[in-house]
């Protein structure tokens, strides 16, 4: 039975540090989708978004539930320092904060973290 028939009206997406926006380089987006394909599948869609606004527009009037999107630490990290396994320096952390601020202004509900999947597993816990 679909969740909506059970009264579920909102889905939280972007959990565990994995999310699909913002990605300003389409190759990085495709790489993230490929890494997560074992968890999320690999749907046959055009991966042509970059911002949170663009991503949320994919769901607008196309799904039966409300979407609450949280930005994962992984796209923030990739946006600031690529796929590097190094510890983020202060400039890279500031860039990540700026990307998160922008994402929330575009409609993200919050941020999620996860240290089990790349590139989030490269992050330092400090």
Where are these regions (language model features)?
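Divalent metal-binding pocket/active-site signature
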Residues: 102-126
């Amino acid at each position: 039975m679909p969740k909506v028939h059970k009264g579920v009206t909102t889905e939280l997406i972007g959990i565990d540090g994995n999310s699909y926006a913002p990605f300003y380089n389409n190759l990085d987006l495709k790489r993230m989708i490929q890494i997560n394909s074992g968890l999320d599948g690999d749907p046959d869609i055009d991966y042509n978004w970059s911002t949170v606004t663009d991503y949320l527009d994919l769901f607008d009037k196309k799904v039966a539930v409300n979407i609450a999107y949280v930005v994962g630490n992984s796209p923030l990290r990739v946006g600031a320092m690529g796929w590097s396994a190094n510890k983020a320096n202060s400039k890279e952390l500031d860039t990540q904060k700026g990307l998160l601020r922008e994402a929330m202004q575009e409609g993200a509900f919050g941020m999620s973290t996860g240290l089990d999947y790349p590139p989030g597993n490269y992050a330092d816990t400090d």
